[in-house]
C-alpha cells in the first residue's frame, strides 16, 4: 500500500508488523554536497539517490551519533529523489530494546529535517502479485525459477553465492538467508512440493550467479 506522510512513520503506524518498508522524498532545488543523516534505522536500510544505491545502514553499527547514521551526499543541481528501503529482521523481546518499531525516524540534510514522504508498505506475504514481465537488473530483485520433484520428500535449497534475502516455494515463504551464516541452506517441507514447482527468491544485495541447488542434505554451517 502507498501512503503520504509529512515525516517517516514506523511499519506499525501503518498496521504492518513484518517485511519491508520504503520511504521516498524529493529534493526540488539545488542542494550542495553535504552529509545526509538517517535516524534510528531498524533494522537494515538501503539508501538510494535517483535509484542508485549509495549506502547500506545496519542498526548494529557502532559509529552512530545520537542515533543517526551519516553518509556523504554529493548534492544535486536540478533536484533528486532519496529513497530508503528498510528490512525488518525480527523482534527484540527483552530488555531496553523491547520497544522495537521498524523503519526510520527521519532523514536530515545537514541539520535540516527533510519533509514530505511517499511510503510503500511491503509485507512480502503476497508473491502471487509480483509482475515478472517487468525488466529487472538492479538489486533488490525478485527472481523466479521452476523445478520438478519426483517425490514429496523433505529437502533443502542451497544458496551459495547469494547474499541476503528470502525464498518462496509455491507461494510459501520458507525463510530468510544471509551470507554471514551460520546456516547455508533453507529447509523445504515435502508437503509443499508438487510435480512442477515454483521458486521465487528476493535478493537484496546481489548474487554471483542466479543458480540454486536443491538436495536432501542440510548445510548448517
Predicted regions and their residues:
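Short clusters of small/polar residues that mark proteolytic maturation junctions
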Residues: 58, 178-179
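Short, positively charged
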Residues: 18-30, 138-152
Amino acid at each position: 500500500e502507498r501512503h503520504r506522510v509529512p515525516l517517516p512513520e514506523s511499519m506499525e503506524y501503518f498496521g504492518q508488523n513484518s517485511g519491508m518498508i520504503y520511504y521516498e522524498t524529493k529534493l526540488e532545488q539545488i542542494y550542495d554536497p553535504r552529509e545526509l543523516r538517517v535516524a534510528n534505522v531498524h533494522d537494515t536500510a538501503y539508501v538510494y539517490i535517483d535509484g542508485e544505491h549509495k549506502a547500506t545502514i545496519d542498526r548494529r553499527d557502532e559509529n552512530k551519533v545520537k542515533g543517526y547514521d551519516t553518509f556523504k551526499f554529493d548534492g544535486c543541481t536540478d533536484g533528486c529523489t532519496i529513497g530508503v528501503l528498510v528490512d525488518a529482521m525480527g523482534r527484540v523481546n527483552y530488555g531496553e530494546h523491547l520497544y522495537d518499531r521498524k523503519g526510520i525516524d527521519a532523514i536530515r540534510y545537514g541539520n535540516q529535517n527533510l519533509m514530505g514522504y511517499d511510503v510503500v508498505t511491503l509485507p512480502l506475504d503476497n508473491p502471487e502479485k509480483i509482475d515478472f514481465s517487468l525488466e529487472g537488473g538492479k538489486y533488490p530483485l525478485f527472481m523466479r525459477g521452476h523445478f520438478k520433484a519426483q517425490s514429496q520428500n523433505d529437502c533443502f535449497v542451497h544458496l551459495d553465492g547469494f547474499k541476503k534475502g528470502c525464498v518462496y516455494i509455491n507461494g510459501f515463504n520458507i525463510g530468510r538467508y544471509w551470507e554471514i551464516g551460520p546456516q547455508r541452506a533453507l529447509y523445504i517441507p515435502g508437503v509443499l512440493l508438487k510435480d512442477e514447482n515454483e521458486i521465487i527468491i528476493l535478493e537484496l544485495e546481489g548474487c554471483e550467479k542466479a543458480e540454486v541447488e536443491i538436495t536432501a542434505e542440510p548445510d548448517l554451517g
